[in-house]
Amino acid sequence: MRRLTFLFLICIIPLLCSELRAQDDSCFSLANNKGYITDKKSVNKTFSQNSSFYPFKSNEIISGLSLDVDITKESSDYLVRILLKDRDGAEYLVLEAYNELFDEDKIILSDYGEETLLLNGICPDSISVFVRNATVVIKNITTALPNSLQTGKTYIKETEALKEHQAKAKAQRINNYNQLHKKLWTAGVSSLSKKNYETKKRILNMANDGNTGGLDYYIGGIFEVGNITSSKASKNQTSSPYVDEFDWRYRHGKPDNYWLTSIKDQGDSNFCLFFSIVGCTESLANLYYNTNLNLDLSEMELAWCSGVSSPYGGVSLGDYDLPFDYLVNHGVCSENSYPFIDTANDHCRSENINTNELVKASDYYHYQSNPDENSIKYLLINGGPMSAGIHANGIWHAMVLVGYGVIKQGDAINTLVNNYTIQEEDTLLIGRTYWIFKDSSFDYITHNPTDGYVYVIFENCSQMGEIYSILTPIIIPGYTSANIVCEDNDGDGYYNWGIGPKPSNCPSWVPDIEDGDDSDINSGSLNMFGYLEELPPGKTIKTPVVYATNDSTPYRLGIVNGGVLTISGTTTLTGNSKIRVCEGGILIVDGGTLQNADITMVPGSTLIIRNNGVINMASGKEFIAPVGTIVNIESGEIN
């Protein structure tokens, strides 16, 4: 099993909140922008629910805005977000506060602004306050008159620098909170964290009163959705009949991006659902045909041609089935034919669709009842990667669900600056399932193996949103079940043929029970709960190996393609030991003796006996060379 180890990607420096403010407040202060002529207005408005007000003159133009605000929180799941809206309808983030950013009961912010510190001469219309479980008092509004120096390239450069500084400061706040509260994830600066508010809102399909909890700053570790620390893991979680860890990325010992295709970027769009569906389909095609097909399908076609009413801005719940129906009934062409363009103003370009390359799914299954962990684990293990995501606290973001794990006492968290090991007292975490998602909204720059994947614990599985399984076979032009690869790569006698029933092109000697891990000769079949059958100890021979001494072996030996076992001494098979020579494998007895032999030859395998080598079969065992094997006895014998 893979040990639960996550690499936290930035150093966490413990600071008190007051100390933190002293260091990072300058990038949130309008007064820090030199050259501004400012105007301060007294407001003294109190808000305990969502509301808007209009403090601006009809002809007013501003280049910056900050607020003096007092926030009194009523619970830890509070949210405050204040937006400036201009007369064209554009929204700018003035401030946002949630527990990971500000965890004091009383928060006092003076001359505070975020995006609104640098505005390119806008006409302000209103200020909107979104509030949950808190009371907000806006005392003063400070605005800056237009500044002729902040235009063109200068404005863009200063805006990008401000985004960078603010993102670093907010990530540091979150990391201090995470360290104080023993959270298992790390915040940092990514392209998503530096997006403007409207873009970030669109990418995450977020409501104005949505609480990200810092998701937009996630760069590694296990993110939490909901109030995980409110109670221990349920009995259903801790007594699950399913295996503790399962991950489609590494099934059968394959490398990264073999079963799962590479990480894609949805840009500034809300195409997460389409990227999720395409990601599932590409991966299921690999898993169904049991090989890497290197498919790259068109999210653009699925978005604009499936009938979704406004794909760029977000998919309504009523439209959710439409792209799945399109995948089944029409199919999706390649990215090369219909490439992704990050634009809100587009339509279905049917002339781009190459009908000779449409990839289809057989059907899909929409999990519509209240999901529980065990049901999701069953679908994932037995059906492959799924479309799911995060649907909680005003966020609705689809991803590809590829695996899960269960947190256990003793699991190690490596943070670069220290190691945190899950302790016995971490009762609120032990037994909880974390889910592994392939994402399309985060631009990672760390080159860590987990880049592009998000690990999430949910308070309850209903927060995973709409859950879909795409059903095989995946229909690809020019491919049939005869193209499914049927192979034994570990030499245990079990064969792997991917997801689905045993294909007719498997050789007649292939057993009906599929190999659960074709990279491990010690593991046999996989049951519905994800547990592997344990086989007697064995060794896979993949390269040339020589047994030159007189010795015995208790191991089952699987000689696979590229493997050569040469026996030049006396080797005695004991216990459950036997030799299986697979397609492309070679067994050579070169002047040595193989005693008590139990040998299975597979068509395409080779046996060579030379220099008076001898094979003495075990009692009751007969040497059989099926049609298609090569047996070359230059000098020697088989008894």
Model segments located where?
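Bacterial N-terminal signal peptides
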Residues: 7-15
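Extracellular beta-strand-rich, repetitive "passenger/adhesive" scaffolds
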Residues: 527, 531-639
